[in-house]
């Protein structure tokens, strides 16, 4: 198919999908018939012709006024079939693309596809795991017989190798249904969500949710499927597991921030402390702590004894790691791009086993590799990365010394790696299996060389309650609150605000309203933030935190009278805080209540005599009230202690108003050492003119300063 035909097919597909979304079935059928003709899809063209004729007859009977109680049900069937045919034609179009990874892989499997059907695809045929994976991923929508055969196969008892093959099959079904919706595969995933095997159940549940996020609009057309989902939600343990999945999906939103934080924030801090020591920017948290310990550096404090940024990073990332966040994306990114092993899609989803045909035989008996795989919280593809990396290193590097150090770093026992993998229990909890699989899926979607051929669910809205029927199944206030708190911890402010907003207002706590207000602040919704803080204050009066947020918002909005009320209450709760006294003074100055402002400023100066902030404010207040000699006295103190450009500018005003224009010019020039601005007096023109200077005086002073 050439580019012109490809563009036409894509245009017709988009037109058909839009018509279906707009409930214009006849227009959709016309576009689909055009697609079928272009793609030379004879069977689809014939069915579309029959469907169009049947719909014409239905419309004809309706126009004649004929009573037909089944008319609406028939119309829904026509719509569903039109959606299914649009998917079938979309797949045909993809296969006709000469350069697409989907089509290229499909053509490579041609010998295996001879006489192929879904029933013959069952693993008894003796195909390799990779061939099975590709055949399933590339499979057409299942027929009823194929769906039944696969459903039976998944419920057959199996040993470990058969279980791994079944897990691969579930992942392949997931990728297939994500790309081209197939209700039969979706139903299989629903049934497998009740599997007693943890690995299989995790993959089925993740697959079900990913397919649903992408194709929720299709699912609603299948009442039997919606009913199954509702029954599934009532199954024992399902809601707890779906909540764990939701939390893990939220954590994936942090992966990029963690990767950037480790490389751009934490590592520069460590490098600064390590000075001469060389560090690799892909070190893990424990390795960073070890390096700091070796250098006799305390990560909690700076050299002057103040809390360090590094301590904050370590605590934040350690908490994220404990909750199951992906801390190793950056570490394994280069490895996965280096080994041909990861150019094969199936290998990203292959449950870890030393019996994988591409893993060196001696890796299984290497105690260091065994210890790493057991002790570190790694997804399956990361474990394969370790095995492949180890196979390239000299034997002495992976010996007992390294094993002992790794055991100490992971807080484990080095003897755990001495027994072969097969003799150790491999059962994982649902949460562990879920973390591993979601992280592995995330890596595939972001690192696989042909990732553009697959739909990336992590780019979608990850909150399940935004999609029917989960919007009616996951509406409990406690669930929404827990999810909102998780999003808040992850600094996903917009998501957290949306979740808090969905909660029943009467059931929200003061703390949740506080967090809702903070999220609204972070996303620029100032009015929403004010409303949330006011509600929190009414539910829990005299909260210092709430009052500070409210006061800051009122102040930033220029409502200084309301801000003043908040600061006065704060001052009564914490009378010894210099910052509160300064804020009180600021509000009083804006309200032209200068006598009160001076009282607050003298108190701030008494509470914090070493700070120049009260001096600056006192100088400015004296300037505003015409007490220029006192203003000058305080500006001299300010100028003696690391003055800012604003300090030099305001001190220039004081000198000029005291009748010392020479000193004023020098100070003005120091306020603008790099680039002189001819408008530097504009902001304070009213103050200067109120003191008796004319517009001409300001113009001449501007020229005197700028013409050096």
Annotated model-derived regions:
Residues 35-38, 206-234, 640-643, 653-679, ...:
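TPR/TPR-like (Sel1-like) alpha-helical repeat modules
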Residues 37, 501-505, 534-538, 568-572, ...:
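Conserved structural position within tetratricopeptide repeats
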Residues 348-545, 549-552:
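Alpha-solenoid helical-repeat scaffolds
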Residues 479, 512, 546, 580, ...:
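TPR alpha-solenoid repeat register
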């Amino acid at each position: 198919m050439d580019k012109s035909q490809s563009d036409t097919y894509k245009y017709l597909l988009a037109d058909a999908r839009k018509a279906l979304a707009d409930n214009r079935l006849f227009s959709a059928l016309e576009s689909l018939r055009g697609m079928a003709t272009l793609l030379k899809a004879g069977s689809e063209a014939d069915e579309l012709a029959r469907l169009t004729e049947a719909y014409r007859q239905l419309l004809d009977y309706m126009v004649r006024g004929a009573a037909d109680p089944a008319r609406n049900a028939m119309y829904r069937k026509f719509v569903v079939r039109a959606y299914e045919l649009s998917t079938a034609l979309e797949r045909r179009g993809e296969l006709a693309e000469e350069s697409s990874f989907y089509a290229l892989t499909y053509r490579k499997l041609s010998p295996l596809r001879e006489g192929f059907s879904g029933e013959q695809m069952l693993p008894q045929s003796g195909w390799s795991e990779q061939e099975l994976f590709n055949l399933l991923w590339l499979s057409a929508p299942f027929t009823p017989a194929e769906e039944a055969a696969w459903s039976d196969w998944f419920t057959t008892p199996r040993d470990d190798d058969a279980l791994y093959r079944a897990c691969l099959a579930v992942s392949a079904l997931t990728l297939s249904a994500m790309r081209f919706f197939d209700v039969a595969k979706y139903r299989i995933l629903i049934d497998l969500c009740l599997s007693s095997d943890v690995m299989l159940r995790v993959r089925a549940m993740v697959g079900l949710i990913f397919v649903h996020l992408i194709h929720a609009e299709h699912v609603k057309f299948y009442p039997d499927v919606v009913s199954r989902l509702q029954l599934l939600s009532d199954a024992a343990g399902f809601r707890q597991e779906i909540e764990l999945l939701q939390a893990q999906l939220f954590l994936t939103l942090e992966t990029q921030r963690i990767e950037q934080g480790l490389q751009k924030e934490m590592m520069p801090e460590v490098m600064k402390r390590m000075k001469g020591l060389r560090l690799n920017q892909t070190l893990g948290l424990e390795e960073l702590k070890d390096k700091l310990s070796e250098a006799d550096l305390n990560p909690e404090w700076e050299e002057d004894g103040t809390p360090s940024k590094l301590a904050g990073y370590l605590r934040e990332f350690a908490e994220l790691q404990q909750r199951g966040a992906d801390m190793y994306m950056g570490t394994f990114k280069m490895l996965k791009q280096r080994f041909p092993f990861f150019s094969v899609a199936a290998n990203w989803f292959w449950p870890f086993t030393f019996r994988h045909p591409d893993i060196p035989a001696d890796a299984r008996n290497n105690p260091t590799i065994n210890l790493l795989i057991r002790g570190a919280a790694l997804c399956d593809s990361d474990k394969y990365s370790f095995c492949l990396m180890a196979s390239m290193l000299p034997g002495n590097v992976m010996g007992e010394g390294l094993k002992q150090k790794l055991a100490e770093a992971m807080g484990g026992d080095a003897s755990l790696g001495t027994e072969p993998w097969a003799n150790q229990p491999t059962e994982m909890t649902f949460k562990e299996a879920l973390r591993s699989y979601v992280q592995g899926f995330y890596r595939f979607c972001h690192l696989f060389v042909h990732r553009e051929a697959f739909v990336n669910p992590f780019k979608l809205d990850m909150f399940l309650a935004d999609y029917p029927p989960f919007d009616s199944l996951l509406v409990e206030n406690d669930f929404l609150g827990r999810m909102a708190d998780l999003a808040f911890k992850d600094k996903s402010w917009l998501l957290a605000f949306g979740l808090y907003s969905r909660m029943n207002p009467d059931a929200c706590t003061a703390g949740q309203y506080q967090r809702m207000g903070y999220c609204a602040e972070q996303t620029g919704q100032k009015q929403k933030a004010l409303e949330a803080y006011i509600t929190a204050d009414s539910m829990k009066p005299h909260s210092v935190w709430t009052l500070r947020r409210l006061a800051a918002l009122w102040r930033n909005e220029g409502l200084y009278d309301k801000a003043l009320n908040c600061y006065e209450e704060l001052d009564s709760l914490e009378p010894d805080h210099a910052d509160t006294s300064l804020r009180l003074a600021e509000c009083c100055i804006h309200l032209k209540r200068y006598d009160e402002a001076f009282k607050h400023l003298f108190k701030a100066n008494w509470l914090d005599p070493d700070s120049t902030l009260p001096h600056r404010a006192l100088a400015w207040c004296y300037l505003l009230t015409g007490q220029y000699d006192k203003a000058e006295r305080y500006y001299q103190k300010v100028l003696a202690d690391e003055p800012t450009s604003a300090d030099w500018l305001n001190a220039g005003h004081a000198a000029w108003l005291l009748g010392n224009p020479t000193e004023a010019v020098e100070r003005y020039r120091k306020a603008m050492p790099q680039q002189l601005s001819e408008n530097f007096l504009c902001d304070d023109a009213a103050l200067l003119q109120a003191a008796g200077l004319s517009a001409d005086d300001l113009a001449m002073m501007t020229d005197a300063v700028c013409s050096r």
